[in-house]
Amino acid sequence: MRATDKQRGFTLLEIMVVIVIIGVLASLVVPNLMGNKEKADKQKAVSDIVALENALDMYKLDNHHYPTTNQGLESLVEAPTLPPLAANYNKEGYIKRLPADPWGNDYVLVNPGEHGAYDLLSAGPDGEMGTEDDITNWGLSKKKK
């Protein structure tokens, strides 16, 4: 080895500066990504509620009434066994499967509803009904029949 040859590479100080810069950038980006995840979850819940409303409307077109609270949203997948029975139930159902909300909870159907013909809601991120973060069909701009 010749004495004039220098080994090339990064110094410890240069590597530490790069790590600090990456840390600062990550601290700026991660909170924005987390906020977007929350918005995306809420938007998915809204989309699910709209899809369930459409399925409920199709059910009503065939059977002249919405499923009751006791029959629940399961009536959109399988014919209800509790009265009032659905005389003209579509043998394929009105939706292939019931979605869970983005937080893993079931959507709830209340019929008759307090805010319209029926109320459809998700408990929201906290998983508790009746709190401010609930996502509801009466909170959407679409008007119910």
Curated annotation (Swiss-Prot):
Residue span(s) of the pro-peptide: 1-9
Q: What does its record list under induction?
A: Silenced by the DNA-binding protein H-NS under standard growth conditions.
Q: Which UniProt keywords apply?
A: Cell inner membrane, Cell membrane, Membrane, Methylation, Protein transport, Transmembrane, Transmembrane helix, Transport
Q: Which GO terms describe its biological process?
A: protein secretion by the type II secretion system
SUPFAM superfamilies for the chain? Pili subunits
Q: Which residues cross the membrane?
A: 10-30
**UniProt-listed InterPro entries:** Bac_GSPG_pilin, N_methyl_site, Pilin-like, T2SS_protein-GspG_C, T4P/T2SS_Core, Type2_sec_GspG
Locate the N-methylphenylalanine modifications and list their residues: F10
Region entry Disordered, spans: 123-145
Q: Which GO terms describe its cellular component?
A: plasma membrane; type II protein secretion system complex
Q: Where is the protein found, in the record's own terms?
A: Cell inner membrane
Primary localization class, coarse: membrane
Which post-translational modifications are recorded for this protein?
Answer: Cleaved by the prepilin peptidase.
Its membrane topology is listed as:
Single-pass membrane protein
The remark listed among the other comments is: Part of a cryptic operon that encodes proteins involved in type II secretion machinery in other organisms, but is not expressed in strain K12.
> Per the similarity annotation, which family is this?
Belongs to the GSP G family.
Quaternary structure annotation from Swiss-Prot or TrEMBL: Type II secretion system is composed of four main components: the outer membrane complex, the inner membrane complex, the cytoplasmic secretion ATPase and the periplasm-spanning pseudopilus. Forms homomultimers.
Cross-referenced NCBIfam families, in alphabetical order? IV_pilin_GFxxxE, typeII_sec_gspG
Query: What name has this protein been given in UniProt?
Result: Type II secretion system core protein G
Q: Which organism is it from?
A: Escherichia coli (strain K12)
Q: What is the lineage of its organism?
A: Bacteria, Pseudomonadati, Pseudomonadota, Gammaproteobacteria, Enterobacterales
